[in-house]
């Protein structure tokens, strides 16, 4: 009967109305959000990741940055904390090159990379992006600071080129700017690792045998367990922590 033929259409209408009444909002995963979703999903599927953490006393690092900026004079560009952390990253990767790598799954090969292109997470009105500092291993703290500032400005203005958003080999994630202590970030595929830095806050800390208030941060390293074992990952993170606690450690590489 004609009435029977119309019943399926009639039955669907209340369901659609119910969804609208529940306040359900559907947002298409397209554009930047879609690209991020696809990349993070692929990373979770393909990379057997592990994370290690360490707390570090950053008091001397903050003092070293102040001294570096004071030494530059009033007209010199200021070196950002992110740039100092990036410089520590490049030094650590020079000591532990296993983490500047990717895995060729089809060939079943680990590909170690001579050049370091450092990605860093930047939050914008359009979402999270990862601009890339090319050949970061060739730059000092001042050069890193200038390039990080330039790329951050372009990210916020929405003027980054595709070449400035691709090709990173290692990522630095300063999630401390969001006021959090720790995280287990998803590796930026096809990289092999990501260094995370939490907020720097005053905490009770045993310093030189006595209890004192020091500026402490939590560092994390999420790494692809296919490219290295825990010894390498732990050694990398410990070296980063040593540089944070005693910036003079970096001078040994000069």
Task: Report each predicted region and the residues it spans.
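C-terminal catalytic/motor cores of large multi-domain enzyme assemblies
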Residues: 2-254
